[in-house]
Amino acid sequence: MSGIIATYLIHDDSHNLEKKAEQIALGLTIGSWTHLPHLLQEQLKQHKGNVLHVEELAEHEHTNSYLRKKVKRGIIKIEYPLLNFSPDLPAILTTTFGKLSLDGEVKLIDLTFSDELKKHFPGPKFGIDGIRNLLQVHDRPLLMSIFKGMIGRNIGYLKTQLRDQAIGGVDIVKDDEILFENALTPLTNRIVSGKEVLQSVYETYGHKTLYAVNVTGRTFDLKENAKRAVQAGADILLFNVFAYGLDVLQSLAEDDEIPVPIMAHPAVSGAYSASKLYGISSPLLLGKLLRYAGADFSLFPSPYGSVALEKEEALAISKYLTEDDVFFKKSFSVPSAGIHPGFVPFIIRDFGKDVVINAGGGIHGHPNGAQGGGKAFRTAIDATLQNKPLHEVDDINLHSALQIWGNPSHEVKL
């Protein structure tokens, strides 16, 4: 294979999956085939999309009801020659799913890149091992928390929140994705003030915390804003990838003047991936493509919290982020939304140690504040790694958290 193989879920009311697959393969490449003169067929053969696989799936009554017609469901695989497109994500996505995305009844499940094509993508700069080296934490999941309620607040408020989270043992604190450039907490001021706080906590408590600052602005200003952040001392850049595009992420990741990890936020991605019938699958969008384009971290809805993905989907995202690939470093999985300490055993059981446990209200809503919330999570992580049930741990901060949010992991076996 020298090009790319696209895997689709299709719904066909003509009940002829083979014909539908061939129509897609031709429609996204040379347009027609059977009516072409033999000589022209020979000339265009190397550009023709090739149907590799057609598999019929069981009928699904809910799908028929939603589409208001009876359809045949199937999985098809089509190979697109590398000759047809330039080796960049805009060209790849337009080739494999451009006008086809308007069909409304086709979902792009996966893209399989040839080794030759993979060479054109950077992958994560740091990856899991690089992030762990920055923090000198190698034997447990990382803990991340989020600034809450920062809109309309000043730098002093930010510093207080940051200090409490760091003292609580949080490894990474990230901006809220809706915190943009503003007069009260400008980008460089946040970074400089944040570093002062984190250095003070490190000197006093010996705990290192990294700050992920939200890089925002117009598309053609992003690189300059990212470089300003780096010059001010940014540890990590948070980036709302899908508000801009995967190619913009790749551009930031490839820039040698932006030598810091990039954390990809999934904002807007639901517009592409939420439907089971059409769009782009979450594992492809939030897993494989983010990793290839250069994200060191990928945030996505966890299977447990308030904005839940199905467990199978969430684990598939993580698989794409962390599976061995000689071309790319591994990216951190960050299952998010509605996470509290009682979910920690689930997260470690399902995602392993190479995961970032990300909490907002589960830290800030603790009765002992963010310090208590962070400590509750750290205790839950340590207990889980020691195979100790959370309800047996004698720790006031963890006990308080379990009293408030419950302990759904009571029967979890690791």
UniProtKB/Swiss-Prot annotation:
Cofactor comment: Binds 1 Mg(2+) ion per subunit.
InterPro entries: Diketo-Methiopentyl-P_enolase, RuBisCO, RuBisCO_lsu_C, RuBisCO_lsu_C_sf, RuBisCO_lsu_fd_N, RuBisCO_lsu_N_sf
Keyword Magnesium: yes
Reaction catalysed by this enzyme: 5-methylsulfanyl-2,3-dioxopentyl phosphate = 2-hydroxy-5-methylsulfanyl-3-oxopent-1-enyl phosphate
Pathway participation: Amino-acid biosynthesis; L-methionine biosynthesis via salvage pathway; L-methionine from S-methyl-5-thio-alpha-D-ribose 1-phosphate: step 3/6
BP GO terms, sorted: carbon fixation; L-methionine salvage from methylthioadenosine
Cofactor(s) listed in the protein's UniProt record: Mg(2+)
Enzyme class (EC, first level): isomerase
Residue positions, PTM N6-carboxylysine: K174
Pfam families membership: RuBisCO_large (PF00016), RuBisCO_large_N (PF02788)
SUPFAM superfamilies registered for this protein in UniProt: RuBisCo, C-terminal domain, RuBisCO, large subunit, small (N-terminal) domain
Claim: ATP-binding is one of the keywords in the record: no
Residues at which Mg(2+) binds: K174, D176, E177
Record-listed substrate binding positions: K148, K174, D175, D176, E177, H265, G338, G360, G361
Enzyme Commission number(s): 5.3.2.5
One GO MF term: ribulose-bisphosphate carboxylase activity
Active-site residues from the entry: K99 (proton acceptor)
Free-text function comment from the UniProt entry: Catalyzes the enolization of 2,3-diketo-5-methylthiopentyl-1-phosphate (DK-MTP-1-P) into 2-hydroxy-3-keto-5-methylthiopentenyl-1-phosphate (HK-MTPenyl-1-P).
Extra remark: Has no RuBP-carboxylation activity.
HAMAP family documented for this protein: Salvage_MtnW
UniProt subunit comment: Homodimer.
Family indicated by similarity: Belongs to the RuBisCO large chain family. Type IV subfamily.
This protein's name: 2,3-diketo-5-methylthiopentyl-1-phosphate enolase
Source organism per UniProt: Bacillus anthracis
Lineage per the UniProt record: Bacteria, Bacillati, Bacillota, Bacilli, Bacillales
Gene this chain is encoded by: mtnW
